Amino acid sequence: MPRSFLVKTHSSHRVPNYGKLETLREANGSCSACKELAGSRHLPDEEAPCNPSDPLQPWDSTSAVACISLPLLPNHRETLGVSGPEPQETSWVGPRAAQAPSVTLKDSFTLPPLLVLPTRWPPILGPDGALNEHLRAEGTSRVPGSFECIHCHRPYHTLAGLARHQQLHCHLPTGRAFTCRYCDKEYASLGALKMHIRTHTLPCICKVCGKAFSRPWLLQGHIRTHTGEKPYTCSHCSRAFADRSNLRAHLQTHVGTKKYRCAVCPKAFSRMSLLARHEEAGCCPGP
């Protein structure tokens, strides 16, 4: 037969690829009586190409979750003589989310969620770097210092800070340790090693005095000592600072809370540096 007679025709409406749903044979979409996906022999083998001019079908709806109906499943259960409701909920997300509203059909079914949040938060990482269910803190609110290292019990405010700290514990089972060529320190990831090597190479150099730093923001704060720029101003008084950390320490003097107390005398201080200076001066010298 000449090749000119071989004409491939396409459907005017896009049909869903029910063949992909065969992987859900053991999920909620299958019959609980015979474990067979009802109507699977009627499913098409391939999906027709999408034409933008075609009218939208229910399976093209993807605003949040669009559901596909399988009306063959209830009829299939009736032929088996099985009574009772069949739990059917499987979510389907189609390719044209912005063009159609969400459509929910009867007897639809929902896919299991891709992400299940833990019942308790915040978590504490165990020795293997995984979440330990029995070590999670009670409640769901994040409190300061709620992320604790299981190795040295050092508290952290965020999970990201705890993850960066645990790079120092090279005995974590990562399968490979990265050793610094300048010292004997080891790290669990290559990224942590590269950040550490910058403390040896000091690539950020001041063009005014030649002083070198490991981080760009450290160099930027140092340049302010040459220019005299103090962009961080206190909202309570007229004092300004070149570094944000100095402003945070200064704000403690306005709050009125002095949590650093001397162990010898009843004096208290708002900053740890002031307490250290007080102790070095000898608040209560002995005989």
Swiss-Prot record:
Domain of life, source organism: Eukaryota
> Hey, what tissues is this thing expressed in?
Highly expressed in skeletal muscle and thymus. Lower expression in heart, lung and spleen.
GO annotations of cellular component type: nucleus; transcription regulator complex
Zinc-finger in keyword set: yes
Could you confirm whether the keyword Cytoplasm appears in this record?
no
UniProt keywords (A-Z) are:
DNA-binding, Metal-binding, Nucleus, Repeat, Repressor, Transcription, Transcription regulation, Zinc, Zinc-finger
InterPro entries, per database record: Snail/Krueppel_Znf, Znf_C2H2_sf, Znf_C2H2_type
Q: What is known of its domains?
A: Binds E-box via C2H2-type zinc finger domain.
What exactly does this protein do?
Seems to inhibit myoblast differentiation. Transcriptional repressor of E-box-dependent transactivation of downstream myogenic bHLHs genes. Binds preferentially to the canonical E-box sequences 5'-CAGGTG-3' and 5'-CACCTG-3'.
Q: Which family does it belong to?
A: Belongs to the snail C2H2-type zinc-finger protein family.
Tell me the protein's name: Zinc finger protein SNAI3
* Originating species: Mus musculus
Q: Which gene encodes it?
A: Snai3
